C-alpha cells in the first residue's frame, strides 16, 4: 500500500547546524525536522527497549545522532524502536520507529507512515535498485517494510519465525526449519520428496525461504534439507554470491545437552552452511585452521549475531560478543582473529565492519561515556578514534523513560577513517 510522505525541509537551518557541528561544543538535541548529516561520518541510533515495556508505565524514547570524526555533532528526537537499526546508503540514512519510517538526506528528513505498528526491528538491507528493506518480528511472523525510491512504503508479512536472515541480491531470504515455521512445512516436505530418492522423509526439515516479492503470507521455499540436531547460527546477514548462500554456523558437540545430563550445550565447532538456491541443495563444510584442527566455539567465544563482510573468497565477521573470525567460503579454511570484549555488563558494545577492519562503539556504562575504536583485521592493536561524554545525557534517560542504549550505528558510505 502506498503511503503519503511528509517532507520536512531544513534549508534555513542547514548552515546553523553545520556551524554547531564543527564548533567542537556539546552535542545538542533538535527535532527530527531539523536533522541532516552535514559533514558527519557516523550515525548512531539510541532507544530504550524491553526494559521500558516491563513496567508498563515507562515512556518510549529514542534519538538519532550524527557525529563527526571528533565525536561532536547533533542529536535528533527520533522516537523509540527496540532493536533499532540504521542504514547509511548513497540514497541517505534510513531508520524507523514503531509507527514511522524516516529517510534523512542533506535536503532534510522525509517521514513515511507504516501500515501497522512494528515494535521490534531485526535488520536493514539496501537492494541493488536503492530500495531499502527493514525486517521486523511480531507475534509469530516477520514483516518486511520496503521503502521504494519512488517515495512508497509497502509491507509484506511472512507467517513463521525465521532465525537466520540475510540479503541475496534483490531478495531477503531466511534459513529456518519446519518446527519454527509450520506454515512452510507442506511446501518444504513436497520439495524434499521431489529431490530425494531414498523414500524416507525426515521428521523436521531445514528450509530456505524468500521473504520478499511473493503473494500471500506464506513465503516460497527455495531450498530444503533434513534438519541437523545441534546446528544453529542466529544471524541477520550472510555471504551470498550468485545463488549460493554461505553462513558460518555452530555445530553443538552435545546436541542432547540438558540440565539433567550435565552436558554443555555451548560447546561445539564452527561449520559453514552452503545453500545453492539454484539446485535447492545444502552442503555442510567443517571450518578448520591452518593445521587442520576444528575452530572451537563455546560460551566465551561465539559467532551469534555477527557483523560480516566478504573480502575476496574470505568472509570476515565479528560476533555480538566481540569475537572476530575469517573463513574462506569455498574451502572452509578459517582463523580466529581477535576479541573485543565489552567493558560494561549492562550495555553492549556494537560493531560495524569494512574491508579493512572493525569499528566498535562502546558505551562504558557507569558514566555513559562513549568511545569509537577501530581495529584492523590483520591483528594490529585497536586504536581510539574519539571519546565523548556528550551522549550521556540522552543515554541516561529520564525518570519516565529509564536508561536508553545504543542500538546500532552506521558509517557514511566510503568513509573508513580508522584505516587512515
Features from the language model and the residues they span:
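N-terminal "mature head" segments of proteins
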Residues: 2-146, 413-420
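Repeated scaffold domains used in trafficking and secretory/extracellular systems
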Residues: 26-34, 77-92, 117-132, 156-177, ...
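Hydrophilic extracytoplasmic domains
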Residues: 36-42, 49-67, 91-92, 103-106, ...
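Residue position within the beta-strands of beta-propeller blades
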Residues: 44, 95-96, 135-137, 173-175, ...
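Short loop/turn segments that connect beta-strands within the blades of beta-propeller domains
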Residues: 60, 89, 96-99, 105-108, ...
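Short coil/turn linkers that define WD40 beta-propeller blade boundaries
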Residues: 72, 108-110, 150-152, 214-217, ...
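Fungal eukaryote-biased detector of long internal structured cores
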Residues: 141-147, 156, 180-182, 217
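Acidic, serine/threonine- and glycine-rich low-complexity intrinsically disordered segments
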Residues: 164-346
